């Protein structure tokens, strides 16, 4: 089997009967459209705009959304909408480029704009439409997020102009009779205040979709799928103690009971005291078998001398598989020869997207994830990945519904490769110990100040550069630590957390005073995009 590409999830009819097809024209916000549709309780999937006609027809969508994109409809070989989209007789919503492509398809005029609109804007509601009636921030106005160079200047026949801005004559167009709609702005981003309301109106009232994509229904669907996939076979789960693998453990335990064995691998790349904490949490809250494996020496030896981030991820992925294979053999020997055939992982949708191994297959490789692009081709197990098409906040909701403790569910994410991708360059035990101590100080101060709950993810990064410092009357030439904290809902986009200066100062002073090997602390003010959340 191909372990690197996502297969379409087959859901039970009750939860998947009403669904939306999203055709991706390359927008950086495309994944957010899927998030917002699912927030409305409606199942959706996203495919590249040029999938073949049969797949569009067979999908059975009750509505189609055309995403934005970086192209111009005037450019040679620019993306075009498949005619099948408009032959199905279902509602269609075009966003940004999707609106422009739809306008051109039906005979409207699209021009390059003299004034490009990027950022916040206020549009005037000039007309009426099923999509917009009763949805506004103030009297006949909407606060939205624009990101376009071209604009529709002449609406196609049958379309009414619903909204405009001083520089964009058609910000919303609508053909209520055929249920075709175009938005020049991005309803999927949080900066568009009524964006969720607009998308909810489209999927529920215009497409007539029920809100059946709920945590309870997702859990029922997944349990049914897991039972069907696994049968009476044995499953090994690589447990990290993070949200994703914990939810997978709960789902599998509910589906197959004692056919599941969890292996917690202490790689030497964990946070301070994390191994003991994970074992304690699972002993107190989960009735699953957990085996702890001390593999610090194995991982550090495998990583010795390697500084390339992609290579480190792949080494860590391969070493994990070696440890799991070893554990599987030992478990088999201790359980009357029962062979473990399945390996379960906490892979989630952003992992797949950033590894460019999703069903689209068109994204640039940003970074491999050890449980996606970092797995060996000759993997001896069949993969079980029940969260592979879910976003992080959906996973958290599943965890809460499954009854996992809030402390476990609300933990900040920790990457599978652990500190291996938070130590820039070569990984050594010395660097790992320094980073562990610095990270623990950062977490302690965040929790004391109440900022841990206000941030989605925070951590320290070891930088393999030295900086001159002064301690007393002496010179200190030591390492640099960077602090990173972000605010995000879905981890597809994020902004750096605006921590109070006095908090940053406290953390910085403690790290430099308590860790002799550190002489300087910096704070990362990069947002995603263009940066990723993790440094490597």
UniProtKB/Swiss-Prot annotation:
Q: Does the keyword ATP-binding apply?
A: yes
User: Where along this sequence does the record place binding of ATP?
Assistant: 240-246
EC number(s): the record gives 6.3.5.2
Query: Taxonomically, which superkingdom?
Result: Bacteria
Keywords from UniProt, A to Z, are: ATP-binding, Glutamine amidotransferase, GMP biosynthesis, Ligase, Nucleotide-binding, Purine biosynthesis
What is any Pfam family matched here? Answer: GMP_synt_C
Top-level enzyme category: ligase
Tell me which residues this entry annotates as catalytic: 96, 186, 188
Q: Indicate yes or no for the key word Ligase.
A: yes
Pathway where it operates: Purine metabolism; GMP biosynthesis; GMP from XMP (L-Gln route): step 1/1
Recorded protein name is GMP synthase [glutamine-hydrolyzing]
